Amino acid sequence: MAPNLRKSHPLLKMINNSLIDLPTPSNISAWWNFGSLLGICLATQILTGLLLAAHYTADTTLAFSSVAHTCRNVQHGWLIRNLHANGASFFFICIYLHIGRGLYYGSYLYKETWNTGVILLLTLMATAFVGYVLPWGQMSFWGATVITNLFSAVPYGGQTLVEWAWGGFSVDNPTLTRFFTLHFLLPFMIMGLTLIHLTFLHESGSNNPLGIVSNCDKIPFHPYFSLKDILGFTLMLLPLMTLALFSPNLLGDPENFTPANPLVTPPHIKPEWYFLFAYAILRSIPNKLGGVLALAASVLILFLAPLLHKSKQRTMTFRPFSQLLFWTLAANLLILTWVGSQPVEHPFIIIGQLASLTYFTILLILFPIIGALENKMLNY
């Protein structure tokens, strides 16, 4: 009998073992769809990004007008740009839901997979930040100035570090060109990291909603989950297309329609919505270095998730108190996101500080305590 090429060819064999004959737990829910959705987001962003880069000029005098030219004169340039800008938002929606799923179902106990995932998140955040600077509008310029300035909080070498990052004494042409370089490079780095992430995942196999070993009940990835993934793609690409075609500027800042002007500061500098929770945490501490450390901690805290797991059960499926805490954390993040978009004045300052405190308290203190408490409850 002739060997099946899909199973014998050196390259096809790898694809087969990852996407076709992969043994998958039969009970994984729609929460397991976000990994493949992130893959689609990455592919879409790289494709639209390459097409945009072909028409973009990384120069302070030309950047803004080159983006306007792309939207006005390039065939479907407006659509490519709108898909790219809003695709970033969908990328972050998917990654936040993917991380939330990981926290809820204890996926962080696959430490290598989890750690590469957190590194992927950090790389994605860096990519989105440098990308936002490229259109060289007011918010691009001032966002770059404010965020890069945070490095000056580093003791001793801070100022030198910032000037080195800027390539001068302020955000200017060298900054824009290096940000374009980074924005072009990082997505390919994300692609490489994604392969590592998947390699680690396929070492152990997928987790499942019950958090128990599922070797006795696995089904092939194709056709079951390949079809389920295609449904997921449709359900994500439909709202993306709707947003890009009907209200492409809904999530953007109107300030960015004004070309960058170093002499005029916008009344309220704020990042895109997906960074607002971290921005709120940064602002809640009235000290530069403290704020920077809190900002870094807000994301780096994810590395600690495996160490803070004290429960005998892997997932939160049968842990009502942990569930309550988890959804409190989710609501708290929404509050932080809202506070980050508000001006720094009376009610918002204290709300932001309380929400920041709650965020760290839940993750660092309450989750381990409740986990240990639920273990005790198993005895009764």
Swiss-Prot record:
User: Which Pfam families does its entry note?
Assistant: Cytochrom_B_C, Cytochrome_B
Please, one GO biological process term? mitochondrial electron transport, ubiquinol to cytochrome c
- What does the UniProt keyword field contain? Electron transport, Heme, Iron, Membrane, Metal-binding, Mitochondrion, Mitochondrion inner membrane, Respiratory chain, Transmembrane, Transmembrane helix, Transport, Ubiquinone
Q: Binding residues for a ubiquinone, per the UniProt record?
A: H202
Task: Please tell me where heme b b566 binds in this chain.
Answer: H98, H197
Q: Name one GO molecular function term.
A: metal ion binding
Q: Does the keyword Phosphoprotein apply?
A: no
Q: How does it sit in the membrane?
A: Multi-pass membrane protein
Asked if the keyword Electron transport belongs to this entry, the reply reads yes
**Cofactor dependence:** heme b
* One Gene Ontology term, aspect cellular component: respiratory chain complex III
Looking up PANTHER family in the UniProt record yields:
CYTOCHROME B
**Additional record remark:** Heme 1 (or BL or b562) is low-potential and absorbs at about 562 nm, and heme 2 (or BH or b566) is high-potential and absorbs at about 566 nm.
Q: Which family does it belong to?
A: Belongs to the cytochrome b family.
| Assembly and binders | The cytochrome bc1 complex contains 11 subunits: 3 respiratory subunits (MT-CYB, CYC1 and UQCRFS1), 2 core proteins (UQCRC1 and UQCRC2) and 6 low-molecular weight proteins (UQCRH/QCR6, UQCRB/QCR7, UQCRQ/QCR8, UQCR10/QCR9, UQCR11/QCR10 and a cleavage product of UQCRFS1). This cytochrome bc1 complex then forms a dimer.
Q: What does this protein do?
A: Component of the ubiquinol-cytochrome c reductase complex (complex III or cytochrome b-c1 complex) that is part of the mitochondrial respiratory chain. The b-c1 complex mediates electron transfer from ubiquinol to cytochrome c. Contributes to the generation of a proton gradient across the mitochondrial membrane that is then used for ATP synthesis.
Q: From the Swiss-Prot or TrEMBL record, give the protein name.
A: Cytochrome b
